Amino acid sequence: MKYEFGAEKPEQFRQYWPGQYDFFSYMEYACAIPQPLFAITTRKADGKPTSTSTPGAAFRGDKGGFFAILAGLCQHTHTYENLRRDGAFCVNFLSKRYYDALIRTVEHNGPAEDEFAVGGFIEETARTVAVPRIAERFLTLECKCERIEDLSGEGLTAMVIGRVATWRWPRIMRKASRIKNIRGTVFSISFTRLRI
């Protein structure tokens, strides 16, 4: 059986929490487009590290640079405030074993909470931006904000485009040249001419 839906939310999609379909399109739940597991890290105004997930991202570039495009970042969050204030973030790719830890950081993200401690993550100093990296990641993109735009014009979510200033992964991965399964995450890498 095949299903086809339009832009309007069908009746059968019930709301699980207040405002669910204000902040997220019903299509994000219906389409279930797979995404790699990653955490966006920033710093709160008081200097505490933050870690959060975002509904989706794309990573693209051309000869003018490589970019992390975060779509659907809620504008009422401290992560959004941090990005606007500091203009920087890290994208930390994590293996599936860190899923529960990442969810804990989302559930316990009050102003006074150290989200790295809540998730059990080790804070690592980034090389080119003044926000932390997660030591447990297998790949980090250190990004400087290029643009922040209201996604729908409703003042609810934003699209953030960050220029990747530095990327880093563990030494063990530097010899990869074909599809690998690294700590539970499958992706393709090819370094035929790159010397690291």
Q: Language-model segments: what does each one mean?
A:
Residues M1-I196:
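Basic, polyanion-binding surface patches
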